[in-house]
Amino acid sequence: MRGGGLWQLGQSVTRRLAQAEKKVIARRCFASEADLKKTALYDFHVANGGKMVPFAGWSMPIQYKDSIMDSTINCRENGSLFDVAHMCGLSLKGKDCIPFLEKLVVGDIAGLAPGTGTLSVLTNEKGGAIDDTVITKVTDDHIYLVVNAGCREKDLAHIEEHMKAFKAKGGDVSWHIHDERSLLALQGPLAAPVLQHLTKEDLSKFYFGQFTFLDINGFPCYLTRTGYTGEDGFEISVPNEYAVDLAKAMLEKSEGKVRLTGRGARDSLRLEAGLCLYGNDLEQHITPIEAGLTWAVGKRRRAEGGFLGAEVILKQIADGPPQRRVGFISSGPPARGHSEIQNEKGESIGEITSGGFSPCLKKNIAMGYVKSGNHKAGTKVNILVRGKPYEGVVTKMPFVPTKYYKSP
């Protein structure tokens, strides 16, 4: 039985997380409430107690009956099922689809083995991040990628603009936006055992970053071993008409241990895993190098360039960026976005981009950007919350160790 003090703390933190998430969601909502889009699982969420809020023009569950703290911990101990169908999946096809995409992203897509994928970044002419995206090389003439819901319109407009110019020069590439499919994320230590009950494919030989077509519970799916929690897990693309039945099947196979989980816990999980949230930790004026994503710039791409903003990005790789994304452990109230970061002399050196109370670590964590030279682990800082300074220390990320199922 939980002690009263911890329970009260948990309830307080849950309310603060929910309030903060709702503020973020409200800022990103691109439609009035009456015009909100609904995923194929909307009625299923409502029937299961989902608290629906607007996000990027969609009505999405922020949480269910469990608190955000309890949902976060349950994902790490058992598992979570998320509806992420608001995100945009699309396919690029044609013999030139890879050369085309490599003009827009920093990754070495040509170097991927068929059936594997990677996180990459769409960049602009100044090297800033238009969006981060998970890209899968299905075959040499078929690329599947997923972009963020809040960036959908600008991403698609950006891709379409460059595709028209590319095709005008004789390039062979076409695209399809998969609005006919839903996307579910099954995450946590029970993700693989639960999914294995529903497919004949041997998931023990299916590793982090890999992609395949397969039947799950008899439904035709795209399966990627990936996620946004730091846990082992899968993202499953399924035709809309089967989404609810597939969700029910996965929950039933877990015997109640895998639970429906909303955006509140998803944000806590990704923060504990040290992962960027576009619009907070990654934006059009921030380069992949500043964001700590240098690893996403393929070796061949560093040598050849050829992508938007390459001159800026390659110079930062060579000389170092002016600012860097780092993690923090802090005292006092949880730091929130735009909280000022000062050095021990009281000089401003950066700002927080994401922060909150870690349900798993039981302490305040945050990430933000500081001027280079202030980024080493162990550096002491002050973080201003409501104008008052609180002690913090630069900390390596992830805050909670990741558990990706990688190839031996």
Swiss-Prot record:
It is an enzyme of class 2 (transferase). GO terms for molecular function: aminomethyltransferase activity; transaminase activity. It is found in: Mitochondrion. Keywords: Aminotransferase, Mitochondrion, Transferase, Transit peptide. The keyword Isomerase does not apply. Its EC number is 2.1.2.10. Belongs to the GcvT family. The glycine cleavage system catalyzes the degradation of glycine. The glycine cleavage system is composed of four proteins: P, T, L and H. This is Aminomethyltransferase, mitochondrial. It comes from Mesembryanthemum crystallinum.
